[in-house]
């Protein structure tokens, strides 16, 4: 209640300064915070398995090692499966390259006849674009090295988070007064449930989308249907923009391996139907219901955090907002912010309710 005694301009200035400082810190410390955020996400997800091992009287260090080993085996199995499919793709890469070169020549000829741009001028434009993209290539290579460093740090962070779980929980309880113990416990429990439910729901959604993608590509007789369907499902896990990117790969493969454009049209129709099913049935029932964040906030946060942390930020943004909503809903002064993030739409806003109260009060006074 004390914060409401300050003038509005002072509160607004303090809040804006705090937000600016927070954004600057998130951007500058991205290399540290992104792997730590992923590690916290995975540690919360792995906690039930770790707790079950502890219930069997397995020593703490051994339980953590077994938990991490299980995670590494699962990730290795998925990567092995994808790499085996990519090897088949690599075997036919020369043929795909030749077909792609032929299509490029046809496009260049069409541009020359349609727009009057000579092939030589087109090549100069492409060379300029390639020179301008050298910086982008360097950034991409840097991102790959960053990814390897994240993969190295993840097991270390997860190990430490599980090892010091009781210490961290004790700290969170001690920084608040004893009368707030129930609120802290409720926030921690709901955060754990929301993150676990969200990630599990996301994996279930990805599995269903992978089956639908592969089935559609098999029916359309697209090469590497299994690989493309699974990659599409993985990309689809990136909120809002992943599904759009996922359709480009099968379209590209169909263009260089098929004659005509009927297959490409079939891919667009099939993926549009799958996206409709995903966005209107799977996501609301399996994923969004777990975090209770409205679509407007989700899109804005995905774009904002994505601009700070890249693709990793788009994936982490929804769980981060879900945790903020849980905290806001438990603090009296921040409850309006929790309602703003939520997906419950009131039939009347508070301005209408207060206006009706004043009118009723005025009528009573007249009587």
Where are these regions (language model features)?
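Generic alpha-helical transmembrane segments of integral inner-membrane proteins
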Residues: 13-21, 25, 62-78, 148-155, ...
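Membrane-spanning helices that line or support transport/gating and their immediate boundary helices
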Residues: 28, 32-36, 48, 52, ...
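Alpha-helical transmembrane segments and their immediate interhelical loop/hinge regions
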Residues: 11, 143-257, 261-267
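Membrane-water interface of transmembrane alpha-helices in multipass transporters/channels
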Residues: 30-38, 219-230, 258-266, 293-298, ...
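Anchoring transmembrane alpha helix of integral membrane proteins
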Residues: 1-84, 158, 322, 326-329, ...
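Hydrophobic alpha-helical transmembrane segments
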Residues: 4-22, 83-105, 139-156, 211-220, ...
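Juxtamembrane membrane-interface segments in integral membrane proteins
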Residues: 49-56, 62, 77-153, 165-166, ...
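Hydrophobic alpha-helical transmembrane segments of membrane transport and translocation systems
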Residues: 264-367
């Amino acid at each position: 209640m004390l914060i409401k005694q300050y003038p509005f301009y002072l509160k607004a200035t303090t809040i804006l300064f705090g937000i600016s400082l927070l954004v600057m810190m998130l951007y500058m410390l991205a290399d540290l915070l992104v792997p730590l955020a992923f590690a916290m996400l995975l540690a919360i997800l792995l906690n039930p398995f770790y707790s079950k091992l502890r219930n069997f009287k397995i020593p703490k260090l051994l339980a953590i090692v077994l938990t991490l080993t299980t995670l590494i085996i699962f990730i290795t199995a998925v990567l092995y499966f994808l790499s085996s499919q990519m090897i088949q793709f690599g075997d036919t890469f020369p043929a795909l390259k030749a077909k792609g070169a032929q299509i490029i020549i046809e496009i260049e000829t069409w541009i020359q006849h349609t727009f009057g741009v000579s092939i030589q001028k087109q090549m100069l434009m492409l060379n300029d674009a390639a020179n301008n993209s050298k910086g982008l290539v360097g950034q991409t290579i840097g991102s790959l090295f960053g990814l390897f460093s994240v993969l190295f740090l993840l097991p270390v962070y997860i190990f430490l988070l599980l090892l010091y779980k009781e210490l961290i929980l004790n700290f969170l309880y001690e920084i608040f007064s004893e009368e707030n113990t129930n609120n802290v416990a409720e926030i921690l429990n709901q955060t754990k449930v929301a993150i676990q439910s969200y990630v599990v729901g996301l994996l279930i959604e990805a599995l269903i989308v992978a089956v639908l993608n592969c089935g559609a590509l098999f029916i359309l007789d697209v090469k590497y249907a299994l690989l493309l369907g699974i990659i599409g499902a993985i990309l689809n896990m990136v909120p809002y923009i992943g599904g759009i990117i996922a359709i480009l790969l099968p379209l590209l493969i169909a263009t260089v391996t098929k004659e005509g454009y009927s297959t490409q049209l079939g891919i667009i129709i099939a993926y549009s139907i799958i996206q409709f099913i995903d966005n209107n049935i799977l996501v609301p029932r399996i994923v969004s219901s777990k975090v209770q964040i409205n679509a407007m906030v989700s899109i804005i946060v995905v774009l904002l955090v994505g601009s700070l942390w890249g693709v990793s930020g788009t994936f982490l943004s929804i769980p981060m907002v879900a945790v903020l909503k849980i905290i806001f809903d438990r603090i009296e002064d921040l409850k309006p912010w929790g309602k703003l993030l939520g997906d419950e739409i009131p039939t009347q806003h508070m301005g209408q309710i207060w206006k009706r109260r004043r009118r009723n009060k005025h009528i009573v006074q007249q009587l």
